[in-house]
Amino acid sequence: VITEAAALADEHGFTAVTLSAVARRLEVRTPSLYSHVRDRDALLDGIASLALAELAARISAAIAGRSGRDALHAFADAYRTYARESPGRWQSLQRRTGETAVRSQAARDVVALTGALLRGYPIPETEHVHVIRLLGSTINGYLSLERNGSFDHSDPPPEQSWPRIIDALDALLSAWPT
């Protein structure tokens, strides 16, 4: 059920995901879905949990054996590629999710991988929450603007700005104020 809902989100947008739309896709009646998910919020949280697991796997593969600037670029590129290839799933991560997704192993994996990335910088662990918020807002903000076409009518193209933004993040993380 969750996999089909995620595919629906990727094909038609996250807001298109409803219990009835998923039921139609599965060629079943909507009430039969309630044996799998409690309600629409649980369905959406299931997509978020799936997205977190997929994203964690991509980040893990991308940053393995890397540190510092190289790891940061790989980390950000993994996010960007995921957002492009799985837009509905990525959108599921841009909302407040329920406790099940927040406390999932996949969420813990993403946090741990982000922590591993940050160990390549001179940032005390007590500052990590601030850095994680900066990374999330910068990367996801850029991806959201890019996805919505906000950069379509200006030069240079977003492909030129992306590495510069990640380099700017690297410079900031390398000189993080404590």
List PLM regions with ranges.
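N-terminal hydrophobic signal/anchor transmembrane helix of membrane proteins
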Residues: 54-57, 63-65, 71-82, 161-178
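An amphipathic alpha-helix adjacent to DNA-recognition modules
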Residues: 2-6, 10, 15-16, 27, ...
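Hydrophobic alpha-helical connector segments
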Residues: 46, 60-91, 98, 107-111, ...
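Short, hydrophobic secondary-structure boundary micro-motifs
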Residues: 18, 90-94, 151-155
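Append "Primarily bacterial transcriptional regulators
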Residues: 17, 21-24, 33
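Amphipathic C-terminal alpha-helical segment
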Residues: 137-154, 171-178
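Key DNA-contact positions within bacterial/archaeal DNA-binding proteins
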Residues: 29-31
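Amphipathic alpha-helical packing segments from all-alpha helical-bundle domains
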Residues: 94, 98-125, 129-133, 158-171
